[in-house]
Amino acid sequence: MTPPLFHIGEVVATHGVFTHLEQHRIAAFPYLRRHACGDWGMVPPEDAAANRFAVEHGARVLSSYDIAGKRVWIITEADRGMTTLLFPDEY
């Protein structure tokens, strides 16, 4: 198993994402693991490159996954203190 590339800190989710995951009985952990291990899901190449830079230089990391028919973003802050799961329209 690939080791995490960075610490994700405290994990929080918006009410909308929390409800969506709960309704579909989907755990967030596999997506958080992918995010921390460098599988950033459905991001364009320029965002993937920005994430690689962010991991090395301490900037914000963004992943994007389709989860049960809805796009969910996972964002880890630059200081690695918090990771948030949210819908793009909640940004």
What function would you assign to each model-found segment?
Residues H57-Y91:
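Short, compact, well-ordered microdomains
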Residues T2-V61:
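Compact soluble domain cores
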